[in-house]
């Protein structure tokens, strides 16, 4: 992707987030974006929209199906994308919208990797640790299970990581022995 395309994607995303923020509807926008991104993942819609073999009329039909969202701003955004023939960039724009919402609201997705599934009490403690250590509000809690950690956990928020896994401690111990 070129710098020009990246700048275009960021401009569309920032504009949508600004409008939603001014009208205090970031939560509704975030829900719409997550639902549409889920549709992209389950249907490979991104390939259809970016394909030159698919006629523009078909792309319009595909995006019209997404307009059932509750947000007026999302529907207007989709209309603008169709009008300017930017369908190929929609997936990246929506990803960027989520990043912009996180920045504006200081609410980031938290990825927790542990050797066993977390209990509800552990999830609430993770949210408290994230709020204290990273000074952010925890958004969605994305839980991953990786038995190779042996024990402990890895918390990742906004490109920052806390790694208390036994696997990492064993690796550090091994490096110290060399």
UniProtKB/Swiss-Prot annotation:
It is a peripheral membrane protein. It comes from Streptococcus pyogenes serotype M2 (strain MGAS10270). This is ATP synthase subunit delta. Gene3D superfamilies: N-terminal domain of the delta subunit of the F1F0-ATP synthase. F(1)F(0) ATP synthase produces ATP from ADP in the presence of a proton or sodium gradient. F-type ATPases consist of two structural domains, F(1) containing the extramembraneous catalytic core and F(0) containing the membrane proton channel, linked together by a central stalk and a peripheral stalk. During catalysis, ATP synthesis in the catalytic domain of F(1) is coupled via a rotary mechanism of the central stalk subunits to proton translocation. This protein is part of the stalk that links CF(0) to CF(1). It either transmits conformational changes from CF(0) to CF(1) or is implicated in proton conduction. The keyword Cell cycle does not apply. PANTHER family: ATP SYNTHASE DELTA CHAIN. One of its GO terms (cellular component) is plasma membrane. InterPro entries: ATP_synth_OSCP/delta_N_sf, ATPase_OSCP/dsu. F-type ATPases have 2 components, F(1) - the catalytic core - and F(0) - the membrane proton channel. F(1) has five subunits: alpha(3), beta(3), gamma(1), delta(1), epsilon(1). F(0) has three main subunits: a(1), b(2) and c(10-14). The alpha and beta chains form an alternating ring which encloses part of the gamma chain. F(1) is attached to F(0) by a central stalk formed by the gamma and epsilon chains, while a peripheral stalk is formed by the delta and b chains. Keywords: ATP synthesis, Cell membrane, CF(1), Hydrogen ion transport, Ion transport, Membrane, Transport. Belongs to the ATPase delta chain family. It is found in: Cell membrane. Transmembrane segments: none annotated. GO terms for molecular function: proton-transporting ATP synthase activity, rotational mechanism.
